[in-house]
C-alpha cells in the first residue's frame, strides 16, 4: 500500500467511509486502481448530484472523455448497444455507443449539455428515444458483481454509489497532469489535497465489500433490520 495514501487519508475502511460521506454530500472522490493495472486515478461524481461546475472540472482537469457508469439493467432499459460486438481492449472496458440528450442541448459538448445528457439518461422513467446516438457522453456498463467480478473503475463507481445509498450511477474521467500525462496515485493525492477530495483505491472497495458481506453472513437477522 502507498504509505502517503495511508498517512494522508487513513486506513482502507476509513478511506471508503470518507468517500461515501463525500458522495452523499454531493462531493467528488478520487479512485486509483492497481499499479499493475491502469495505474490511474479517476475523478468520480454521483450522477444524481452532478452539477455543471463538477462537469467543467472533469473536462478541464481530466482526459475529457467523460463516462457515465451504468448498471446492466439501465443499459438494457435504454436499449444501448455495446460500442463493438467483440471487445478486444486490454481491460475489457464495456463502452456502449455514446449518447446525447435529444432536447435541451445545443452542440452537446458543453458542461451544461453533458450534464443534461447524464440527467436524461439516469432518470427513473428515461426512455431510449430520449437519447440520440452518437453523442458526447460515453456510457460504461458495470459488471453485475461489481468489483468482486471486475476490479475496474466502472464497477467501483457503481458499487460506491450503492454503498452510499444513492442511485447506482456515477460519472468519471481519468485525472491528467497539466502536461497531458496520466496522474499516478501520488499526483492524485496532491490534486485531492488541493481540492479537498477523499482518495481511495479499487482494492479498498473490494476489501470493504468483502468485509461487509462477511458481517452480513454472520448476522443475517441484524442486517435484515437495516434492509427493511
UniProtKB/Swiss-Prot annotation:
Record's cofactor remark: Binds 2 divalent metal cations per subunit. Magnesium or manganese.
List of residues binding Mg(2+) 1: 38
Gene Ontology CC terms, in alphabetical order: cytosol
Biological-process GO terms, alphabetical: riboflavin biosynthetic process
Domain of life per record: Bacteria
Pfam families: DHBP_synthase
Site (Essential for catalytic activity): 136, 174
Record has Lipid metabolism as a keyword: no
Function: Catalyzes the conversion of D-ribulose 5-phosphate to formate and 3,4-dihydroxy-2-butanone 4-phosphate.
Family per similarity comment: Belongs to the DHBP synthase family.
Assembly with partners or alone: Homodimer.
Protein name: 3,4-dihydroxy-2-butanone 4-phosphate synthase
Organism: Chloroherpeton thalassium (strain ATCC 35110 / GB-78)
Gene name for this UniProt entry: ribB
